[in-house]
Amino acid sequence: MVNKVKRRVSCFPKATYYKPREIPLCCLEIANISIEELEAIRLCDLLQIEQNEAADRMGISRKTFWSDLQRARQKVADALVNGKAIEISGGEYINTGECRVNFLCKECDHMWEPKFDQNRPTNCPSCGSSLIFRLGGDGRGKRFVENDYCCPKEKGSSRNTSEGSKKKLQ
């Protein structure tokens, strides 16, 4: 297997999950977009940077950038047209340090910001647990799974009586 060149990524999304409204996540297919694919979309489509410059910023060839961009656009289009959830995660990238990323340990609630030249941590520096999650911005974007199930009708979930549901029923 050929080693994939790690792309330089300078910004991370504030939210890492998007899904169609009113459909439980457990009932949806998920389109996974890697961090570097999102960076390609951000540079080319959002910031409208020419592909040559965008490829240089990511430290890859123009052909590789084009492949990443096309793959990402195809995944987004598939999710939007076919009603899939979009998860932004994973990939082989290097954080250039321009955006801050925090991690949270689910075991001990320790929150920390790794050094910019560090790869994604695999364990909590406080307790050593591998149950760590990246926080986007103010904590939004974490996958919402309560008690290992996601459908509101299962196991008498208390989410049926959430404030949003109450407003909808009235």
Swiss-Prot record:
InterPro entries associated with the record: RNA_pol_sigma_r3/r4-like (IPR013324), UPF0251 (IPR002852), WH-like_DNA-bd_sf (IPR036388)
Sorted alphabetically, which SUPFAM superfamilies does this protein's record hold? Sigma3 and sigma4 domains of RNA polymerase sigma factors
HAMAP family reported in the protein's UniProt record = UPF0251
**Family under the similarity heading:** Belongs to the UPF0251 family.
Stated name of the protein: UPF0251 protein MA_1017
